């Protein structure tokens, strides 16, 4: 039978059935949704569409390019989990990647960039007095084993110092770096272009989705 986007198979406004007066047409054809799943076994299909054009139907993905707007940088990173979808909870349960889905991405590539750009290591946990003593003993052993740090040139040090002047970081994002997972939104259409690209959530948008996710967790616990 196939999925048809015509109106010939629909009833009339009065409720009566219409007689099929012509065969189906190729241009009225519909295709089933991609329902791109989160999986390390990347699978993307090439689909020939009207006009001889091509669509890329992603069936399984686990990586994408995510931009950090306030820092004007983009990094390829792993998608770890789907945590929220405004339209459908079923898509969260089945870990389906669609446009505007809220996902958790790996923070490591951004952490690495931040260290090289600002000379600041993000996500380091604050140590208590008891743990510092233990770390002191372990640190001595590690210092012997660890390779020497690459010496930075004076020019690079000046450049990092000038960047430090205008540096500011949202406290919510800093907390996320400590956990190693950043909340992001998918802005591409995986079922159409075969990619799950997006942007890191910040500011008011981040606060909004954090509240939504927290509310959902509260309902689940009840």
From Swiss-Prot:
Biased composition (Basic residues): 8-26
Record-linked Gene3D superfamilies: 3.10.290.70, Ribosomal protein S8e, subdomain (1.10.168.20)
Cellular component per GO, a single term: nucleolus
Pfam families on file: Ribosomal_S8e (PF01201)
Biological process, per Gene Ontology: translation
One MF annotation (Gene Ontology) recorded for this entry: structural constituent of ribosome
Region of interest: Disordered: 1-37, 125-147
Keywords assigned: Ribonucleoprotein, Ribosomal protein
Highest rank taxon of the organism: Eukaryota
Family statement: Belongs to the eukaryotic ribosomal protein eS8 family.
Protein name (record): Small ribosomal subunit protein eS8z
Species in which this protein is naturally found: Arabidopsis thaliana (Mouse-ear cress)
Lineage, highest ranks first: Eukaryota, Viridiplantae, Streptophyta, Embryophyta, Tracheophyta
């Amino acid at each position: 039978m196939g999925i048809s986007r015509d109106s010939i198979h629909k009833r009339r406004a009065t409720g009566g059935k219409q007689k099929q007066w012509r065969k189906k047409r190729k241009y009225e054809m519909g295709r089933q949704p991609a329902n791109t799943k989160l999986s390390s076994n990347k699978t993307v299909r090439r689909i020939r569409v009207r006009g001889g054009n091509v669509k890329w139907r992603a069936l399984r993905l686990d990586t994408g390019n995510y931009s950090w707007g306030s820092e004007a940088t983009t990094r390829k990173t792993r998608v770890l989990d789907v945590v929220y979808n405004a339209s459908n909870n079923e898509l969260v349960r089945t870990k389906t990647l669609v446009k505007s889905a809220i996902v958790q991405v790996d923070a490591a590539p951004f952490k690495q960039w931040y260290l090289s750009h600002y000379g600041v290591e993000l996500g380091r946990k604050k140590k208590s007095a008891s743990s510092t003593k233990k770390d002191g003993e372990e640190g001595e052993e590690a210092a012997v084993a660890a390779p020497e740090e690459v010496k930075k040139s004076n020019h690079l040090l000046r450049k990092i110092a000038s960047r430090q002047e205008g540096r500011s970081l949202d406290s919510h994002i800093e907390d996320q770096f400590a956990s190693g997972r950043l909340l992001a939104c998918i802005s591409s259409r995986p079922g159409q272009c075969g990619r799950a690209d997006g942007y890191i959530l910040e500011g008011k948008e981040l606060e909004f989705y954090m509240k939504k996710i927290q509310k959902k967790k509260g309902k689940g616990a009840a």
